[in-house]
Amino acid sequence: MSKYKRIFTIVIDSLGIGAMNDSEKYGDVNVDTLGHIAESVDTFNIPNLQKMGIANLHPIKHVAPVENPIGYQAKMAEASVGKDTMTGHWEMMGLHITKPFKTFTDTGFPQELLDELTARTGHKIVGNKSASGTEILDELGEHQIATGDMIVYTSADSVLQICGQEETFGLEELYRCCEIARELTLKDEWKVGRIIARPYLGTKKGEFKRTSNRHDYALKPYGRTVLNELKDNNFDVISVGKIKDIFDGEGITEGNKSKSSVHGMEQTLEIMDRDFTGFCFINLVDFDALWGHRRNPQGYAEELEKFDVNLGKVLEKLHEDDLLIITADHGNDPTYTGTDHTREYVPFLAYSPSMKGHGQLETPKTFATIGATIADNFGLKMPEGTIGESVLNKLV
């Protein structure tokens, strides 16, 4: 019989807790998402993360370590090459990514790809550079509305992003164009991790706002993950936020899209009221998309405080045979130069009301510790070719 009937893993997207040993290879020097956020604000109140021991793992201004934190804590290192969303999440579920996904940050996309995209979609392309979503809309949003051209851009991540104004370009047309882009970028030389549909509203510079109708078209995972094992063995695999997109639906039995990170936590609280056996995997993207990339430490701090209030409600709802794991998929230090992710350790905070002990675990060498622990709990073997060692027997 399983130790835990339900396991909830919440990914606070981009909440790194200090530079990994190899971070300088990624251009990241002295980065520290959580530490630098706390240093950027006058007050910082996260009592529930505090009692789960986050400040015991990592010094945080305004947040003291606690003598007896609930549950277990560890700093997790990333084994894979990269610092992006897909690499982080895929590794959590057992995959070891040894070749980074293709990026076009410095060059933009090849003309041959753009020509094919224009021929297949019927839209001319503007942009074709690395930019923040808000900047590119201010620069080209009015042009798109006037011409029907398609805004294509990228970032430091392995992504091809297409913007479309919902009312003039149309949501279905945007999705159609993204599906064509996904098909074209399955070629090895153009193989990006994700195509992202970026719909927006507004009619003039300074007023454009991206909507919650974003859609990600990810590559299928390179191999079987713990999610596949769970689903194939008739366990529930419920996703919240962009998890279903990240895994291209592989191993998911129920997907729930979120309008915001606060909404994602509300959805999680509703799911906690249901009887199920298996895994609920939650991604809260606003931390990364709204505050990390936009280099807004104050906004990030406020979002963490809102999250912490809802975390308190999650802790109250946990059953004796539930396990909660809180983690992140990479860093995105909002005080660092540029607008890109940062290569950092991430937190592993694990708690169940049935735990008698507490304390810090040794630093796991891979995010796949999470997937291995979940598989172990449900009596499943890790899929062939995956990595990760369970810490289930240490959670007592």
Curated annotation (Swiss-Prot):
Its cofactor is Mn(2+). InterPro entries: Alkaline_phosphatase_core_sf (IPR017850), DeoB (IPR010045), Metalloenzyme (IPR006124), Phosphopentomutase_DeoB_cap_sf (IPR024052). One of its GO terms (cellular component) is cytosol. It comes from the Bacteria. The keyword Metal-binding applies. Binds 2 manganese ions. It holds the Pfam family Metalloenzyme. The keyword tRNA-binding does not apply. Mn(2+) 1 binds at residues 13, 329-330. GO terms for biological process: 2-deoxyribose 1-phosphate catabolic process; 5-phosphoribose 1-diphosphate biosynthetic process; metabolic compound salvage; nucleotide metabolic process. Its main location: cytoplasm. Keywords: Cytoplasm, Isomerase, Manganese, Metal-binding. Mn(2+) 2 binds at residues 288, 293, 341. Its EC number is 5.4.2.7. Isomerase that catalyzes the conversion of deoxy-ribose 1-phosphate (dRib-1-P) and ribose 1-phosphate (Rib-1-P) to deoxy-ribose 5-phosphate (dRib-5-P) and ribose 5-phosphate (Rib-5-P), respectively. HAMAP family: Phosphopentomut. Belongs to the phosphopentomutase family. This is Phosphopentomutase. It comes from Clostridium perfringens (strain SM101 / Type A). The lineage of its organism: Bacteria, Bacillati, Bacillota, Clostridia, Eubacteriales. The gene is deoB.
